[in-house]
């Protein structure tokens, strides 16, 4: 899956994703390039949607993901590995992690669903206030949206769509018969 976060604090969002190329990517859609230090080779494919939060209260987001084979990874915003990671989860991971202070002790826990059951990693550092994408599709409603609207004031012809058009849609959502 794809998640969205302003990893480099430039005011625009980057796209974070993993896949069958064994890499975790952080792509800047404005520049059309990966951020410096990214992608990172995890040496195995991943089915998780990366999640982001300030795990160590330094003001920067950390990126959390896992390999399908059961290794959890955490990277700082600049692509450097978090201390003591990767860490084995003891089972295959085919879902996205979730981040939150589930025990109310002031630090984050990261929950992974594995083939061996739920695994919880307790991050024993004061948690920061920044949480961008802390679970699958970004929120409990699974909207996959930050609630933002793309607005353009560019008047150059052809850049902004002037009409909505659907062609050769199958199955047709407007005429299901």
What are these regions (language model features)?
Residues 154-177:
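Glycine-centered coil/turn sites that cap beta-strands in beta-rich domains
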Residues 1-151:
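Extracytoplasmic/lumenal domain signature
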């Amino acid at each position: 899956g794809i998640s969205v976060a302003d990893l480099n604090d430039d005011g625009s969002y980057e796209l974070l994703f993993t896949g069958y190329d064994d890499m975790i990517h952080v792509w800047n859609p404005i520049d059309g390039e990966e951020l410096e230090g990214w992608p990172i080779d995890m040496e195995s494919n991943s089915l998780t949607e990366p999640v982001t939060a300030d795990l160590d209260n330094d003001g920067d987001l950390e990126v959390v993901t896992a390999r399908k084979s059961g290794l959890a990874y955490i990277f700082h915003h600049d692509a450097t590995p978090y201390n003591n990671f990767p860490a084995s989860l003891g089972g295959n991971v085919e879902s996205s992690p979730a981040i939150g202070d589930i025990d109310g002790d002031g630090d984050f826990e990261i929950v992974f669903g594995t083939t061996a059951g739920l695994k919880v990693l307790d991050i024993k550092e004061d948690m920061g206030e920044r949480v961008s994408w802390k679970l699958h599709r970004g929120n409990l409603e699974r909207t996959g949206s930050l609630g933002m609207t793309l607005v353009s004031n560019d008047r150059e012809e052809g850049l902004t769509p002037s009409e909505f058009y659907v062609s050769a849609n199958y199955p047709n959502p407007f005429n299901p018969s």
